Amino acid sequence: MDDSKHILITKILKNEVTEALGCTEVGLIGYAVSLCNISDPFSIDKLELTLNNGSFKNAYAVGVPNTGKYGILPAVVGGLLGNSKNKLLIFNDITYSQELEDFIKEKLEIKVIDGPLFCNIKIKDNSGNYFESLIKDNHLNVVIPKIEKEKIDVEITTSEKGEYKNLELIDFLDYLDEIPEKIGKLVEKTVQTNKNLIKGDFLNYGTDILSIIVNKTTSACNTRMTGENMPAMSVAKSGNMGIMATLPIISYDSSTENNSEKLIKSVLLSMLVTIYSTYNSSYLSSMCGCVSKGGMGAVIGLCYYKNGKNLKKLDSSARTFTANLPGIICDGGKVGCALKLASGCFAAYSSLFVDISYENGIVGKDFKECVENISKISKAMGDLDCDIVEIMSKKM
């Protein structure tokens, strides 16, 4: 394939496939808090947290690793106890303090705004000192304080995202023929890390292939949403999207051929499609991205595993998936996400066996048009977030 396309895809993958501990948004909050570098948390007089509505939703009711607790408050406390060098793994090795939680609870003020990813921390201590941090647009884009970028950090520009959006499915397929060694190892790490999240049964329907796919995928999601101290490999800044994009294919492989080469290529293709779907819409939205974006990745990855480089069948699977689940709302990260992933698994697997025609609803002519149509609906659902957040806020 064209060298410039190959370089672009490799750079995108290095940026968008990363390790995260706990729901990405509680990690975002914890990381932002830690950047304020408060030496004595008990000196805090006021702590103001401003989140965009999507980040608020995803942090509101999800488990926070190493705390045994759920939601925004323990994420803030965990951030005060963590090391900013850990970034989205901020809750690694913290020793949680109930005393500090009780103290911070009286100092914390939460504000929710509309718009893209935004996490702003403002702290005033009892000596009148002010501290601030700001992360916006993506989970690792630290605007305040100014920090020196590490060499391993890969900055993706707006124009590069635009170039990626202009790629065709055949470009992703061609990339699979020339996988760089580092990317191959990244995919292997992703497969193993996300497999490790499978702990027991969440939805154990039986022993057929679909039931195994559903059970393993939902088990991994439940492990993450309950705040187990186990990392997930996120795709497009979402751990659950990473789970949805990988576990159905991993489960299908283990139930059928156990073919490591096909597994790596299929999972990689799924991740490329998930990122592509995200760039066509947004990182966070009113539509469940795990189903609509990670699900589309799983569909294409499964179809590739089963049928190889067959564009006709890949387009067919994309059409069938588009006729099914897009439109499910995102009401935040929580244990219930596992049920949405179960629906996504069914839709992805069934898309291998049915061909829904272009004339149906929002179904596109091919993969690319299907993604564009789903993205258009996702963007049109934007106003729903205000109502979803209003309903959730009443529970605080």
Curated annotation (Swiss-Prot):
GO biological process per UniProt: L-cysteine catabolic process to pyruvate
Keyword Iron: yes
Binding site for [4Fe-4S] cluster: C288, C330, C337
Protein name: L-cysteine desulfidase
Cofactor: [4Fe-4S] cluster
Reaction(s) catalysed by this chain's protein: L-cysteine + H2O = hydrogen sulfide + pyruvate + NH4(+) + H(+)
Subunit-structure text: Homotrimer.
Protein EC: 4.4.1.28
Keywords of this entry: 4Fe-4S, Iron, Iron-sulfur, Lyase, Metal-binding
Family assignment from sequence similarity: Belongs to the L-cysteine desulfidase family.
Record flagged with keyword Zinc-finger: no
Function as written in the Swiss-Prot or TrEMBL entry: Catalyzes the cleavage of L-cysteine to form 2-aminoprop-2-enoate and sulfide. The former then spontaneously hydrolyzes to pyruvate and NH(3). May be responsible for the production of sulfide required for the biosynthesis of iron-sulfur centers in this archaea.
Cofactor note: Binds 1 [4Fe-4S] cluster per subunit.
A single MF term (Gene Ontology): L-cysteine desulfhydrase activity
Active-site residue list: C23
